[in-house]
Each structure stands twice: as structure tokens, then as C-alpha cells.
Amino acid sequence: MVSFSSLVLAASTVAGVLATPGSEQYVELAKRQLTSSQTGTNNGYYYSFWTDGGGQVTYTNGNGGQYQVDWNNCGNFVAGKGWNPASEKAVTYSGSWQTSGNGYLSVYGWTTSPLVEFYIVESYGSYDPSTGATHLGTVESDGATYNLYKTTRTNAPSIQGTATFDQYWSVRTSHRQSGTVTTKNHFDAWRNAGLQLGNFDYMIVATEGYQSSGSATITVS
């Protein structure tokens, strides 16, 4: 994954009922659907969709802070909505998320100077993100315990191209698909563990998949 580790089944079914090729609704839906990497703004939210091009992945921007992603035998992808630049804000999200294999639902983002990729993992599939990571302790936040980890990626994709950078992880011990994440608690916990955060780039509530299939419909605020 762009990490330890990308979107048309449910959307196309609805489109078949509500919109026909050439209709205004069909054209508008097509504008919102993405199958290749792209970033931008939609309904006041920043969105980011990155895919390595493997398998079938369709990302669709919905109303407000909502997005949908469907994937089938994907390579690796990360997609979601949020903010650019990020801040130490409380992030609220809700919806449905499921995968038959390796995937994460997380508050995800980057900093620069230093270049850091960070994850606050709310739920994950068959692959435990703590595998091979250095455990740095725990933090209590939003009614749960999160385990803190650090890893290093070498010559990997990043917001600055191929680079070597650290990943910071905060992994919730009890999985969930809705709630509020007080991001400041996690940023402070990483700092207290001796990890340096740089200047905030973007932060999204992300769905990520790696060599798996699944679907997600998430609303952020």
C-alpha cells in the first residue's frame, strides 16, 4: 500500500436505474466517477484518489462530505475526502466499509519537512498494520485504546514522488465504522513518543485496499 500497507458496482447499479446514457443525470454521475489518480475539491471538501492502476477501482464523489469507492481484485489504492491543509481538528465520519481482504479505514494524511505519512486506523481487514512495526506505546482517545507504531518506507510512492519516509500509526484496538476522531490526541501521542511531525499537507478519511475487493460509502464532517 502507499503504506504497509483501488471503484463501479453499487454506483453503476444505481446509475442504471436512475440515469440512462446521454441523460443529464448520467453525464453528471460520470463526471463524479474516477478510475485514475486525481485530487481536487468537491462540495467544499478536498478529495484524493491514488491508485497504482491494478484491478478495478472506482471512486465517486457524493454530496457534501460523502464518497463511495468500489474495488475488485485491486492492486493498491487510497481514496477519500477531507481537508487540505490538515489541522489538529476533530474528525467525524460515518457510513459502511467492508473488504474481503487487506484494507484500512483510517484518518490518513501527510506532513512535509519532514515527509511523514500518518494513519489513525479505525478498522482493518485481514492484514494487521502492526506487522513488522516498532511499537511505541498506547494512547487512550475517544473511548478506546490505540496502539502507536512507527515504520520506514524506502523508495516508495509519496506526495513528493518516490521517496524514503517514516510512517506513523495509531491503530484502534476495537474496530468501528463511525465516530469522532480527536486527531490532536494522536498527534500529541506521536510527539510524546519522540516522533516529529512537519507541516501539514492534506488529511482525509481514507479507504485503502491492497490486493483485495470491497466497497465503502463514507461521509466526513
Curated annotation (Swiss-Prot):
EC annotation from Swiss-Prot or TrEMBL: 3.2.1.8
Keyword Protein transport assigned: no
Superkingdom in the source lineage: Eukaryota
InterPro entries named in the record: ConA-like_dom_sf, GH11/12, GH11_AS_1, GH11_AS_2, GH11_dom, Glyco_hydro_11
GO molecular function: endo-1,4-beta-xylanase activity
Pathway in which this enzyme or protein is active: Glycan degradation; xylan degradation
Cellular compartments per GO CC: extracellular region
Record-annotated active site: E117, E208
Catalytic activity: Endohydrolysis of (1->4)-beta-D-xylosidic linkages in xylans
Main location class: secreted
Keyword Ubl conjugation: no
Location of the GH11 domain: 33-221
Any one Pfam family match given in the protein's UniProt record, by short name: Glyco_hydro_11
A Gene Ontology biological process term: xylan catabolic process
Signal peptide positions (record): 1-19
PROSITE patterns xref list: GH11_1 (PS00776), GH11_2 (PS00777), GH11_3 (PS51761)
Annotated localization: Secreted
Keywords recorded for this protein, A-Z: Carbohydrate metabolism, Glycosidase, Hydrolase, Polysaccharide degradation, Secreted, Signal, Xylan degradation
Family: Belongs to the glycosyl hydrolase 11 (cellulase G) family.
Function: Endo-1,4-beta-xylanase involved in the hydrolysis of xylan, a major structural heterogeneous polysaccharide found in plant biomass representing the second most abundant polysaccharide in the biosphere, after cellulose.
Protein name as catalogued: Probable endo-1,4-beta-xylanase B
Lineage start: Eukaryota, Fungi, Dikarya, Ascomycota, Pezizomycotina
